Amino acid sequence: MIETIDLTKKYGDFFALESLDLKLEQGDLFGFIGPNGAGKTTTIRILSTLLAPTWGEAYVCGHSIYTHPREIRRAIGYMPDIFGVYDDMRVIEYLEFFAAAYRIDGAERRRVAERSLELVDLTVKRDELVTSLSRGMTQRLGLARVLLHDPQVLLLDEPASGLDPRARIEMRGLLKRLQELGKTILVSSHILPELADICNRVGIIEYGRLLACGDVQDLLAQVRGRPVIRLRVVGPPEPAARSLEKCQEAAGVTVRDGEILVALADGVTDPSPLAARLIAEGHALTSMRESEVNLETAFLELTRGKLGRPS
């Protein structure tokens, strides 16, 4: 359903995307994982025919982005990370407006809009003003909009961004239901663990390069038995993280949600030198524990030593 071959986007000497080879089969729910600026949005915009690559090829539903962009636009539902709404419209009016933009026949617009609301469990809000919706409800409305023309492929850029924990759970459940309806879904996120439960395949991207791609369980299996240590200190964690980067026992160090994650070097099983280093340099260590293997630790392990921006 989606395939990219040597897909590259440059701005001057800067590679926003570099030699991306990616393939999604029909029915895949594919998680595109990476921090902000990794190349996720660039990839999605190219697949949506909104951005031309510097070189390389991409196909969606068998159509080339170069020769058949109209066919691709008919086949996809694209939801950007930020989208606008019309403040003075009711929810049902908003969807009928976009149904008209999709050139859906007038007699069908209300039925199609009602169907989309039902798919995203938003029917109860059909007569509410768009401005009255919560952030989570607004995200659902955006998803309902891209479902109006019954696309085969969904390209969703950070659909859970800014949502509270409950809304994130509801969004994950919604994406899983859409996959069960036969949709092929590419969903990007910089929050690594939230995709583990719903995606059958994931790709890890950083600095425009795809570093790992495969079944979730296969990626997790690659890092089982490799310890990742989580540490917390008093005060900002970044200075302590910089100290740990100098430890020969540390193969990779990152900071996430106020916590320091350290991938131990090959053959290292004892994390005590990490604590000793922090204490010696005056950092007040409050906790240290070995992390369970999940997508977050898989990301740290699979990218260690590979994350330097090319000069």
Give short role names for the model-derived ranges.
Residues 2-5, 9-212:
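ABC transporter nucleotide-binding domains
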Residues 77, 103, 142, 216, ...:
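A generic structural signal for secondary-structure junctions
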Residues 5-7, 253, 288:
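Generic beta-strand hydrophobic packing signal
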Residues 172-265:
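ABC transporter nucleotide-binding domain
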Residues 266-311:
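C-terminal coupling/interaction segments
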Residues 73, 117, 220, 275, ...:
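Conserved protein kinase catalytic domain
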Residues 1-8, 305-311:
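ABC-family P-loop ATPase nucleotide-binding domain
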